[in-house]
């Protein structure tokens, strides 16, 4: 029987797929003809595990990564964005690492399940260089910009800073 997935690319038509085998993150390759079309397959995106932590507010996300064009993933992951530029994907990665975004995620994420509906309270952003947020800054500096943008009180900021673990 012919193998569908391979440990290394064997053709220019191959797509890299991020998945899990025995709870370990793996990369395999598959011919593009076996992959259903998706809006972000040929775009930059951020890939995050669909299952993460226990649901406690403030948890760090388990190793989010930038997905380059021609990288897909199994249903063990979710992806955010479909960008033409790596800059936008990097800005998105910084955003999901902010305390602000993860606090908003924590308002709906009460289990380890990190499915798309749990992100509903995380405000969408402009991740281009024209954004009102300077994405070239550090994550903590981006948090400060987000606190100001959304008019958070000193009490709200103190709560986030105390309860949400930092990510770099």
Where are the predicted features?
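Short acidic, low-complexity intrinsically disordered linear motifs used
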Residues: 145-157
